[in-house]
Swiss-Prot record:
Gene3D superfamilies: 1.10.287.3240. It comes from Caenorhabditis briggsae. Disulfide bonds: none annotated. InterPro entries: V_ATPase_D (IPR002699). It comes from the Eukaryota. Transmembrane segments: none annotated. This is V-type proton ATPase subunit D. GO terms for molecular function: proton-transporting ATPase activity, rotational mechanism. GO terms for cellular component: proton-transporting V-type ATPase complex. Residues 214-259 are annotated as: Disordered. Belongs to the V-ATPase D subunit family. Subunit of the V1 complex of vacuolar(H+)-ATPase (V-ATPase), a multisubunit enzyme composed of a peripheral complex (V1) that hydrolyzes ATP and a membrane integral complex (V0) that translocates protons. V-ATPase is responsible for acidifying and maintaining the pH of intracellular compartments and in some cell types, is targeted to the plasma membrane, where it is responsible for acidifying the extracellular environment. Keywords: Hydrogen ion transport, Ion transport, Transport. V-ATPase is a heteromultimeric enzyme made up of two complexes: the ATP-hydrolytic V1 complex and the proton translocation V0 complex. The V1 complex consists of three catalytic AB heterodimers that form a heterohexamer, three peripheral stalks each consisting of EG heterodimers, one central rotor including subunits D and F, and the regulatory subunits C and H.
Length: 259
């Protein structure tokens, strides 16, 4: 039988059952490769979309922070230094961040959401003077906080998607360049071995038939050399005689008891 050991294949015994099993595994590997390829395409599409949003938000973040800085300068100019008032009134953070998970083709992406916990504790700040500027200041910084949380979500999703895409691409390449070729090499080996087994079986049957035919010819030649079989001596005479009755008693053989 042919070896095929030089190829990278699965160690199996060549049989019809193994061939059917390898065909099933090949079909499953091809289907898995197709699904992973679609998953990688979907992740790449979402990855490019997130990258575009990150660039846009960073540009917008610069403008929002610049506007918030100008609002802070205006509020300090009109209302004076109110930082000590804010610090004294702080008991807990008003803005909090909660996280939820978003499923994208089997990959869980973290999504951060900013929300205000409780009423505004600084409603009376700037009541004497500069109230409008302080209100505008709070609005601008609230917008900056929301934008920062959104940017944090995008950057976290960017990193998570980058790792998921790398893992998916490694799996796709492993199936395409390792698993499927191994199964195909195994199928080729099994088919080659089965064909060789069939050829050997056919040759063996032909050899047996040839030996039987040769033996019959030798027996026929031997019978021809010996001629017809001879009949046994007296065989014809005994055949012409009627069968002897063993119960009948011949008179000559009777014993003489009395004279």
């Amino acid at each position: 039988m042919s070896g095929g050991g030089g190829k990278d294949r699965i160690a199996v015994f060549p049989s019809r059952m193994a061939q059917t099993l390898m065909k099933t595994r090949l079909k499953g590997a091809q289907k898995g490769h197709s699904l992973l390829k679609k998953k990688a395409d979907a992740l790449n599409l979402r990855f490019r979309d997130i990258l575009k949003k990150i660039v846009e938000n960073k540009v917008l973040m610069g403008e929002v922070m610049k506007e918030a800085a100008f609002s802070l300068a205006e509020a300090k100019f009109t209302a004076g230094d109110f930082s000590h008032t804010v610090i004294q009134n702080v008991s807990q953070a008003q803005y909090r961040v909660r996280m939820k998970k978003e499923n994208v083709v089997g990959v869980l992406l973290p999504v951060f959401d900013a929300y205000q916990d409780g009423p505004d504790a600084y409603d009376l700040t700037g009541l004497g003077k500069g109230g409008a500027n302080i209100a505008r200041l709070k609005k601008n910084y609230n917008k900056a906080i929301e934008l920062l949380v959104e940017l944090a979500t995008l950057q976290t999703c960017f990193i998570t998607l980058d790792e998921a895409i790398k893992v998916t691409n490694r799996r796709v390449n492993a199936i395409e360049h390792v698993i499927i070729p191994r199964i195909e090499n195994t199928l080729t080996y099994i088919v080659t071995e089965l064909d060789e087994m069939e050829r050997e079986e056919f040759f063996r049957m032909k050899k047996i038939q040839a030996n039987k035919k040769k033996l019959k010819e030798q027996e026929a030649a031997q019978r021809a050399l010996e001629g017809p079989p001879k009949e046994e001596a007296g065989g014809t005479h005994s055949e012409n005689q009627p069968p002897r009755n063993l119960l009948a008693v011949e008179e000559d053989n009777l014993p003489v008891l009395f004279n």
